[in-house]
From Swiss-Prot:
Molecular-function GO terms, alphabetical: DNA-binding transcription factor activity; transcription cis-regulatory region binding
CDD domains xrefs: AP2
SUPFAM superfamilies listed in its UniProt record: DNA-binding domain
Gene: ERF091
Assembly with partners or alone: Interacts with MED25.
Listed name of the protein: Ethylene-responsive transcription factor ERF091
């Protein structure tokens, strides 16, 4: 029997153990009392407490083999580490910690997702193009589906550069089945966010149906935004000299300003340049000929 490094124990302790074992009366096996585990070595009886008959029997025993076996047993018992009891009934702190960790793992919080009292998950987002108005996205069976709906709405409204999503951007774009183009997702026009109100019609559907319905609602919004961006790009290119057959708003305004300047020049040309013309159409005023200071004094003295 080998339990590691064997250390020799005191012979007096072994004698006390043997004396305690032999000194116990064995008249009736049912009346044998099991020694308590909590008893220490000091509490064991010594050789002085052993009766005379038992002491003579103890001296006749050969302790050569028993000494080594008891030493190995005692060393093995002493080398066993004290293991912590993991029973949840006796150690409730461990069970409570593990339970709280499991609960915290299950209840992960997502951006834009709220749990309803009846177990469903609601998703909503604030539209930054309309002064932070709350936009309802629907109610879903799981928190992941609601978080995905929020991510898709965030990408469509704020764009891929400014959107803060719950999942990775590649996962969201793959779910939307769109090309990863940052300019395509920018929704700066306030009118383009109005179709999001119709997402209330999604209602209490399954996750796939809700996401599909939301995609159908917002696809029209993206097409409208593309048309608006195309018009603005065309108008911008025309203002830079790439003019087409149609007149842009900037050109119309510039032409009106040039017309106003020409009208002012014509009014200036209509002013009288000779002394014979005393009437001017400018602002409906009369202009008199300069007759000199003498004529003015004569005219005033006559009154």
């Amino acid at each position: 029997m080998a339990f590691g490094n064997i250390q020799e124990l005191d012979g007096e302790i072994l004698k006390n153990v043997w004396a305690n074992y032999i000194g116990t009366p064995q008249t009736d096996t049912r009346s044998i009392q099991v020694p308590e585990v909590s008893r220490t070595w000091e509490a064991l009886p010594t050789l002085d407490d052993i009766p005379e008959g038992s002491r003579e029997m103890l001296q006749s025993l050969d302790m050569s083999t028993e000494d080594q076996e008891w030493t190995e047993i005692l060393d093995a018992i002493a080398s066993f580490p004290n293991k912590t009891n993991h029973d949840p009934l006796t150690n409730p702190t461990i069970d409570s910690c593990s339970l709280s960790s499991r609960v915290s793992c299950k209840t992960r919080k997502y951006r834009g997702v709220r749990k309803r009292p009846w177990g469903k998950f609601a998703a909503e987002i604030r539209d930054s193009t309309r002064n932070g108005v709350r936009v309802w996205l629907g109610t879903f069976q799981t928190a992941e589906e609601a978080a995905m709906a929020y991510d898709k709405a965030a990408v469509r409204i704020r764009g891929t550069q400014k959107a803060h999503t719950n999942f990775q951007l590649e996962t969201v774009i793959k779910a939307m089945e769109m090309d990863c183009n940052p300019n395509y997702y920018r929704m700066n026009n306030s009118n383009t966010s109005d179709p999001l109100r119709s997402s209330r019609k999604i209602g209490l559907r399954t996750g796939k149906e809700a996401v599909k319905a939301y995609d159908e609602v917002v696809d029209g919004m993206v097409e409208n935004h593309c048309a608006l961006s195309y018009c603005s790009t065309k108008e911008h290119s025309e203002t830079r000299g790439l003019r087409g057959s149609e007149e842009t708003w900037f050109d119309l305004r510039k032409r009106r300003r040039s017309n106003e300047d020409s009208m002012c020049q014509e009014v200036e040309m209509q002013k009288t340049v000779t002394g014979e013309e005393t009437v001017c159409d400018v602002f409906g005023l009369f202009e008199f000929e300069d007759l000199g200071s003498d004529y003015l004094e004569t005219l005033l003295s006559s009154f």
